[in-house]
A protein has these predicted regions:
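Beta-alpha junction/loop-to-helix N-cap segments that form part of ligand/metal-binding clefts
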Residues: 116-118, 133-214
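An alpha-beta-alpha
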Residues: 217-288, 323
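Short beta-strand elements at the ligand-binding edges of bilobed clamshell
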Residues: 206, 213-237, 355-374
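Short beta-strand segments enriched in small/hydrophobic residues
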Residues: 93-122, 127, 249-254
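Segments of small-molecule ligand-sensing domains
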Residues: 401-409, 423-491
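Periplasmic-binding protein-like
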Residues: 167-180, 199-208, 250-253, 303-323, ...
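Long terminal accessory regions outside catalytic cores
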Residues: 1-96, 479
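Extracellular/periplasmic periplasmic-binding protein-like sensory domains
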Residues: 330-416, 493
Length: 507
């Protein structure tokens, strides 16, 4: 107070100028955070969803979910544009297939980034051949859309909502791929195939690598992979061969509650193998719990007491290094041991821990076999079961676009066959009339026509669909991962021992 009047204090920002800078920074930061929260778009049809902000939705290939799939996404985008331009110019109709799966796997996923890329490459090769080679007819042409289902219920729901919005505009009739055999996957597929009157999408669904037997329950779903029962029966048939006849088997199973793959694989193998050939006790572990490596060490210590000749591993490939590591230094490693697994092990050579696997194979007197879904080495071992190499032959479209990528994990072949199966049903329904329309409900009716003379000539073997949507006597390659890291097919088996051939279908 001066001369009876109050003097206003200088503002804090004026007394300390740096406070103004600090305040402006806070405002900018808050504004940026608000913008990020409000602007969830990643691209056309794709947006950030969930706490991790993963980009989920549907793209025609313009948006790349990761750099890992950038090249194949760009090729799909180019082919889709060509299909649209052909309709504009010549009136040639098209329909769309959505390839739906988790597109951004992390280190906990059973799917590797290489396997994901290969699967999409195979899907693209099938799209390209459908639009350029016409072995399954020529109309309608095929667009391929890529949908990321993410890793949570919220993200899966967002992806399905985006598909729903685009059904009419993009003429979507089928969803392919679909991921792996989990409870979450099954529920997602039910929403895909359920009638629209019940809140579903009412689209045909074709799984690429779904093997759990429980997926037979899903109406409107077919799959191109052998079921776990088929894989287990094929493994049991292989173990009846001269080299393995009489050898005793110990089963090790992942008891993770929501993994239908591991549970049904174990159940099917126990049913397929004669009781006298196996130990009564099934050794279990739970991969969803901490300390699985310690559990494997304790579990494997019992091997020298049990003295099995074969360990049948009903688990995920991501856990294989932890299973094998204790075998390298077991007391009884003078006794040879065969570890036999299911198809999920096909991705182990691309995953973390493969060097540890090779160390055990080199030093632990261990042989590693698995029943695969597809492998190029099978084509020469059982030619009658494999009517065509198709896109994967030396002059095929896969080699044209992805010559440097390997086929050993089988994912490219399975992605290709899933899309080829959808195309076969589309063209069977669409025929040659350019104005005949195909719908999702029509697709679900046509799935069961794909048998006999209409069986699909897949690169993974003949796909003759049964009424439950699973392929009949699908070829199952028995594959070895050698101590040198080389992956080779050693036999081709099937449920019942012999895979389906064209001669069988001809009567």
């Amino acid at each position: 107070m001066t001369d009876g009047s109050w003097v206003r204090a200088r503002p804090l920002w004026a007394r300390w100028p740096w406070n103004a800078v600090f305040g402006a920074s806070l405002i900018a930061l808050a504004g940026g955070l608000l913008w990020w929260m409000l602007n969830t778009s990643c691209g056309d049809g794709v947006r950030r969803v969930g706490p991790d902000g993963q980009c989920v939705g549907v793209t025609d290939g313009k948006y790349h979910y990761t750099q890992n799939v950038a090249k194949v996404s760009a090729l799909i985008r180019k082919e889709n544009r060509a299909v649209e331009q052909e309709e504009s110019k010549n009136g040639t109709p098209y329909v769309s297939i959505v390839y739906l799966m988790p597109m951004v796997p992390d280190e906990k996923d059973s799917n590797t980034v290489d396997a994901l890329r290969h699967e999409l490459q195979g899907a693209y090769a099938a799209q390209y051949d459908a639009n350029h080679h016409f072995s399954n007819g020529d109309v309608p042409r095929i667009k391929l859309l890529l949908a990321n289902s993410g890793s949570s219920a919220e993200q899966r729901s967002a992806a399905l909502d985006e598909i729903r919005k685009r059904i009419e505009a993009d003429r979507i009739v089928a969803v392919a791929g679909l991921g792996t055999s989990t409870n979450a996957t099954k529920e997602m597929i039910r929403k895909v195939t359920r009638p629209r009157s019940e809140g579903g999408l009412e689209l045909g669904a074709v799984g690429a690598v779904l093997t759990a037997d429980t997926f037979d329950e899903v109406e409107g779903l077919v799959r191109v992979a052998p079921t776990n029962s088929d894989e287990a029966a094929a493994a049991a048939a292989f173990l009846q061969s001269k080299e393995y006849a009489g050898k005793r088997v110990l089963v090790v199973q992942d008891s993770k509650p929501d993994d239908q793959y591991t549970r049904t694989l174990s159940q099917a193998f126990l049913k397929a193998l004669p009781e006298k050939r196996r130990f009564a006790r099934v050794e279990q572990y739970d991969s969803s719990q901490a300390g699985s490596a310690t559990n494997f060490k304790a579990l494997m210590a019992n091997l020298c007491t049990y003295k099995p000749d074969v360990v049948y591993f009903a688990g995920r490939g991501v856990d294989l290094p932890k299973l094998l590591a204790p075998l390298r230094t077991r007391i009884c490693n003078d006794r040879p041991l065969t570890v036999f697994a299911g198809d999920d092990v096909s991705q182990s050579p691309q995953a973390a821990g493969f060097d540890e696997i090779l160390e055990t194979l080199r030093d632990g007197n261990v042989e590693l076999l698995y029943t695969g879904l597809a492998h190029p080495g099978a084509w020469k071992l059982a030619e009658g079961a494999y009517p065509t190499e198709g896109a994967f032959g030396e002059k095929g479209s896969y080699r044209k676009f992805f010559r440097n990528d390997q086929l050993d994990d089988g994912q490219a072949i399975m992605g290709h066959d899933a899309v080829t199966t959808a195309v076969s049903a589309i063209r069977l329904e669409g025929g040659t009339a350019a104005d005949q329309k195909v719908s999702g409900s029509m697709m679900m009716q046509r799935w069961k026509s794909l048998h006999g003379v209409h069986a699909v000539a897949g690169a993974s073997g003949l796909i003759s669909l049964q009424n439950n949507g699973s392929p009949e006597r699908k070829a199952v390659p028995v594959i070895e991962i050698g101590s040198d890291g080389i992956v080779r097919t050693v036999a081709v088996s099937a449920n019942g021992g012999d895979p389906l051939t064209r001669k069988d279908l001809a009567g």
